[in-house]
Amino acid sequence: MAGNSFGQLFRVTTFGESHGLALGAVVDGCPPGLEISEADLQIDLDRRKPGTSRYTTPRREPDEVKILSGVFEGRTTGTSIGLLIENTDQRSKDYSDIKDVFRPGHADYTYHQKYGQRDYRGGGRSSARETAMRVAAGAIAKKYLKQMHGIEITGFLSQLGPIKAEGFDAAQIEQNPFFFPDAGKLEELDQYMRDLKKEGNSVGAKVQVIATKVPVGLGEPVFDRLDADIAHAMMGINAVKGVEIGDGFAVVEQKGSEHRDEMTPAGFASNHAGGILGGISSGQDIVVSMALKPTSSITVPGKTINTEGEAIEMITKGRHDPCVGIRAVPIAEAMLALVLMDHLLRHRAQNQGVMTQTPQLR
């Protein structure tokens, strides 16, 4: 399996499985001198961890991160940062009956065909449990971005099933278990999720993440455009089936006179492009949305096959999220932070001394 690392100068490598002893990550390229502690990383890990509300999986993992290396006397040393989270609430017996069965809609079949074997306990390496380490690594990037450049990254659930956020109150996002910015829809969300759990079903969601105060100039055309790397990062998150930058697929119905973000001496008149032009950050807010599919781990009977190719009907057991989009919010924030961190270091390496007479717009 060769796809366990992400980034070039700020590079993150993760390891571990859903029901293994532990999850881990190695973070390379972090500049020295950044104040960082396990408590800093724990903030975002607590936002992502399972068992925090009745709307997510009942699996209870404390997700307590340990910094093994790369930090001395509270500051990064510039060497590899080793991170570890122990798994403590595995129930592998929940999966013994699917050892020879492919769960429809999961990675079971493709992992089996590619590698000739698979860890059937909670999906093994294909489980979203792995994303805990992305969140831990992303927390390092988020702190650097904010402390050194003033960059803030905020994610939220913009749609759950048919329920869309119509109002936006940033203060509400961390005040409810949905990361939802529209307080007027919380009761509707609660009832919808209750009904969904009674059905034994699941539903998809849309997550939006916004980065503010991003400097102009990040992105490496032509193959490492900033939007291309962001899309790559978001599509690497479990269950993500689509990514939009700015207005995304809505541009299909727009005319050029509407979509172009006109410029004045006072700044940009709009931000349909989502803060990226020609693969390079424009200095405006970077706006990213992603669509997540409904999890296939449901108690509604479904058709599948076993390893012998025989047709069977199955009901998925175990502990699962009825909507994976809820806990995807801090994951999306982390992945955007990793991309921006990597591109800041790459930009600094080649273009640090570049100056123009043109004022920077917002």
Curated annotation (Swiss-Prot):
Membrane spanning stretches: none
Extract the InterPro entries matched here.
Answer: Chorismate_synth, Chorismate_synth_AroC_sf, Chorismate_synthase_CS
Annotated FMN binding lies at 125-127, 238-239, 278, 293-297, 319
- Could you say which residues bind NADP(+) here? 48, 54
Give the record's keywords alphabetically.
Amino-acid biosynthesis, Aromatic amino acid biosynthesis, FAD, Flavoprotein, FMN, Lyase, NADP
Cofactor binding note of this UniProt entry = Reduced FMN (FMNH(2)).
Main EC class of this protein? lyase
This enzyme catalyses:
5-O-(1-carboxyvinyl)-3-phosphoshikimate = chorismate + phosphate
Q: Does the keyword NADP apply?
A: yes
A cellular component term, taken from the record's GO annotations:
cytosol
Q: NADP: is it a keyword of this entry? A: yes
An example of a GO molecular function for this protein is: FMN binding
Q: In which pathway does it act?
A: Metabolic intermediate biosynthesis; chorismate biosynthesis; chorismate from D-erythrose 4-phosphate and phosphoenolpyruvate: step 7/7
Reading the lineage from the top rank, the first entry is: Bacteria
Q: What is its EC number?
A: 4.2.3.5
Share an example GO biological-process annotation for this protein. aromatic amino acid family biosynthetic process
Required cofactor(s): FMNH2
Which family does the record assign?
Answer: Belongs to the chorismate synthase family.
Q: What subunit structure does UniProt give?
A: Homotetramer.
Function recorded in the entry:
This reaction introduces a second double bond into the aromatic ring system.
What protein name does the entry list?
Answer: Chorismate synthase
Which species is listed as the source?
Aeromonas salmonicida (strain A449)
Whichever gene encodes this chain, its name is: aroC
